[in-house]
């Protein structure tokens, strides 16, 4: 069996918080099944502006407040929100920053054009999720990364967290999806 007692699953889309598609339904089903098997699962995703905080009962994690993420020369506030998955004993941590995730769209604008700062949003999400796990002191055995927006997590862990006792023994699984991403990141 691949999963041990602690698994952190990082994903970009998760039902019921965003409209259902291949990634959201797959990540939710996998996380629930793993959690139901007795493993500890933590799900991380961006707190996109389309997510209704009231309906999904998101609330800020005060003990994690005051954290910042540095990207290039920008020192950006990191806000962590949490909600419970309906019908499961599992929490979803939302990585939030007004500049990157307040928009009412996920990756593209109303005309379908990619946001020019998707690369910085990807960095912020990846670093924010890693920093959050480190501050929680929660040592994952497996980190399952889903989709392109969390695809920098393995590289970041290898380059900057290789000796960190929280992450050094973690195994990484990457799941890629054909979700219509067109274009590139700078």
Task: Describe the role of every protein-language-model region.
Residues 39-41, 92, 140, 172:
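Hydrophobic anchor at the start of a short beta-strand
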Residues 47-135:
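A conserved catalytic-core segment of Leloir-type glycosyltransferases
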Residues 44-46, 175-176:
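Generic beta-sheet signal
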Residues 118-186:
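Conserved nucleotide-sugar donor-interacting segment of glycosyltransferase catalytic cores
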Residues 29-39:
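A short, Lys/Arg-enriched amphipathic alpha-helix followed by its capping loop at the start of a domain
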Residues 13-15, 48-50, 98-102, 149-150, ...:
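Short, solvent-exposed loop/turn segments at secondary-structure junctions
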């Amino acid at each position: 069996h691949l999963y041990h007692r602690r698994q952190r699953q990082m994903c970009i889309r998760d039902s019921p918080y965003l409209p259902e598609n291949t990634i959201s339904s797959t990540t939710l089903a996998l996380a629930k099944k793993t959690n139901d098997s007795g493993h500890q699962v933590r799900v991380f995703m961006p707190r996109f502006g389309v997510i209704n905080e009231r309906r999904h009962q998101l609330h800020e994690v005060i003990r994690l407040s005051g954290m910042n993420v540095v990207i290039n020369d920008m020192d950006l506030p990191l806000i962590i929100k949490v909600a419970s998955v309906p019908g499961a004993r599992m929490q979803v941590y939302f990585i939030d920053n007004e500049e990157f995730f307040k928009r009412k769209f996920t990756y593209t604008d109303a005309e379908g054009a990619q946001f020019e700062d998707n690369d910085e949003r990807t960095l912020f999400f990846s670093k924010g999720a890693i920093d959050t796990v480190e501050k929680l002191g929660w040592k994952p055995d497996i980190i399952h990364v889903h989709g392109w927006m969390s695809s920098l997590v393995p590289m970041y862990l290898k380059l900057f967290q290789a000796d960190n006792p929280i992450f050094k023994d973690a195994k990484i699984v990457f799941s890629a999806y054909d979700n219509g991403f067109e274009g590139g990141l700078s």
